[in-house]
């Protein structure tokens, strides 16, 4: 689920070039209550499928992380679009750790429009290693747990999800 996105903001450019030409924007904050009711209805009626929630509006991140933590099979997605820079990735990971479960985080992603996205994944892993290293150096986390967490969010969590 991509939340808080405003698609095709420039109508002249959309008319000339069509969708996915670079005029999407950060959208308004979403209603946490509406998201909770929707996820609860899905969970009650049919069981919660594997669900990943991405927000393009960083002001929603803590709320969405806490909501994701309240439901089985719901995870926070990586910082995306306007948030996939050093500060955005760091903030998304820290907010997820504080309000949900970083241990189930799926790490960086890409889409079919990306070409040679190794650099994006390498960049993410370097930032993740920096965060985990800060926690270890600050005495907040032990080294073995940090290595295990790095492996999970860089490889094992998505492997497990895609093999289900």
Region roles according to the model:
Residues 1-4, 52-54, 76-79, 102-120:
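Short acidic/histidine-rich active-site segments
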Residues 1-59:
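Divalent metal-binding pocket/active-site signature
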Residues 9-18, 61-70, 86-93, 115-130:
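Histidine/acidic-residue-rich catalytic or RNA/ligand-binding cores of hydrolases
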Residues 25-29, 119, 145:
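Alpha-helix capping and helix-loop boundary segments enriched in small/acidic/polar residues
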Residues 44-48, 70-76:
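Glycine-enriched alpha-helix->loop->beta-strand junction motifs that scaffold or abut catalytic
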Residues 56-59, 76-95, 142-162:
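C-terminal helical cap
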């Amino acid at each position: 689920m991509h939340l808080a996105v405003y698609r095709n903001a420039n109508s002249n450019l959309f008319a000339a070039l069509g969708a996915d030409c670079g005029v999407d924007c950060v959208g308004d904050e979403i209603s946490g209550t509406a998201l909770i009711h929707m996820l609860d209805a899905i969970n009650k009626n049919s069981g919660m499928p594997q669900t990943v929630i991405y927000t393009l509006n960083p002001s929603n991140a803590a709320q969405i992380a806490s909501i994701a933590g309240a439901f089985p099979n719901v995870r926070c997605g990586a910082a995306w679009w306007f948030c996939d820079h050093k500060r955005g990735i760091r903030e998304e990971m820290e907010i997820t750790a504080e309000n949900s479960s970083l241990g189930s985080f799926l790490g960086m992603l890409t889409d079919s429009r990306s070409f040679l996205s190794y650099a994006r994944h390498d960049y993410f892993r370097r930032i993740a290693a920096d965060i985990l290293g800060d926690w270890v150096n600050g005495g907040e986390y032990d080294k073995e747990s940090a290595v295990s967490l790095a492996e999970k969010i860089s490889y094992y969590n998505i492997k497990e999800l895609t093999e289900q």
